[in-house]
């Protein structure tokens, strides 16, 4: 789970055991965008912004470098996470390697990405929806 805080580099709020093992350390509080090579940082930050602000899911292909210099291919799924109104924006997701047996990974690079879903419908409270439909002069019947 990532916090939507661009100034801090979108830090991890919580990270699972497998993700921490892939990166060789506990990720809580560490910057997500700092995992990426400098030439991919801006792109991943743009993807995070689209997922959070437009409430769209994103799937990305990532290539990382292992400790022995071999490339490792991963898949990233980012989903908007908005539990309640007036709570901080955050994201949840999945980072999974293709194949296994990778040592600690570094220097992530985006190879591809796409957005899933459609523009969500804005939900308006029911009372306001009724008022948007009602136009002009209205007569309400009262008790007789």
Predicted regions and their residues:
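A recognition module on extended beta-rich or small alphabeta surfaces enriched in W/G with H and D/E
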Residues: 114-128
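Sensory/regulatory domains in signal-transduction proteins
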Residues: 1-115, 144
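Short hydrophobic short-linear motifs embedded
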Residues: 125-143
